[in-house]
Amino acid sequence: MIRVGIIGGGQLGRMLALAGYPLGLRFRFLDPSPDAPVADLGELIVGAYDDPDALARFAEGLDVVTYEFENVPAHVARALERQVPVYPPPAALDVAQDRLSEKTFFNALGIPTPRYVAVDDRAGLDAAVAELGLPAVLKTRREGYDGKGQAILRDAADLDAAWQTLGGRPLILEAFVPYDRELAILAARGRDGSVAVWPVVEIEQVGGMLHRAFVPARSVDDILAATARGYVEIAMAELDYVGVLAIELFQVGDALLVNEMAPRVHNSGHWTIEGARTSQFENHLRAILGYPLGETDALGAIGLQNLIGEMPDPSAILAIPDAHLHHYGKAPRPGRKLGHITVRAADEVTRDERLAGVDAAACLASGRGSSSNLTR
């Protein structure tokens, strides 16, 4: 019996386990919370990610270790690597955990990003604004996700408030990008260097969190798709990567700029569970175990919507043809990802109609107005 260890017990770990059980895998998780969403899916070691005793109990007898979020301390991953193979490699954490390191990594590979300046103090912020101009986005270099740890600077009056909120730690100022839309590209790379890439995803974000995703992304020509594919393949090769890697992109005209990367399975790839021949979760497991990678083509026109704060009535969702509900087993809380819904259709028009129905049900549950703008 192959035993897989997953650092982190959230919904990504849960979906990895659900993809792995048909392969005959067994799972052990490390998470600080006894109520983590994975609690009923395998052995759960409750402890801090840097607790030596918890780590020792976690690592014992495992065949491979992976992680479901990128803020695992890199030194912890390296320590585990002395006992058991760890994928993706800890070097990927070094890059992804620091926004400055991430930008310099891509630029060194010839891959464009928004312009940026490191900010270490208040005077440095003024100098960075003078160099990049306004508007701009001030971000913490470490941690921060789903729109957290950042502030938009629209004019000089915003600087003091942003510094009061974010100052006192390493920051980065990024030039504001007037992008046409946001895209994502996900790929899996095996131990043998083989690569499988899913179709380009169009994503819509609300408040810094992914709200909806569409596959195929509309009007993506072969050149644009090849550019996105090239970015992820170059990054994977440089890191000798194993597992799934996601890269979020800004499209500006015919150009693609890298916004950020995630060295793990990713929200923009949840559609692959029902919408691709092989899901990101299964291919991640195949990759880290040295199995052949599965095919990644989409099974029609696919849409995804996140469920934030409140869960809708399952009956309302499941009445929509080819709609698939995923509940993460988390207690409702404002701003919290509780689940997602994937819809499939033979064409984009039908897909968008079904996704509008999903949105209406989700809005009814949350008490907000419809967010649908699906005249795409």
Language model features with spans:
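Short, low-complexity Ser/Thr-rich regulatory SLiMs
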Residues: 187-191, 249-253, 329
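Active-site "cap" helix and flanking loop/linker of ATP-utilizing ligase/carboxylase catalytic domains
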Residues: 226-247, 252-253, 262-310
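ATP-binding N-terminal substructure of ATP-dependent carboxylate-amine bond-forming enzymes
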Residues: 1-104, 123, 359
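Protein kinase-like catalytic core scaffold
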Residues: 196-199, 245, 256-260
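Active-site nucleotide/adenylate-binding loops and adjacent lid/helix of ATP-dependent enzymes
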Residues: 95-184, 188-235, 357
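Peripheral (often C-terminal) accessory segments that flank ATP-dependent C-N-forming ligase machineries
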Residues: 286-376
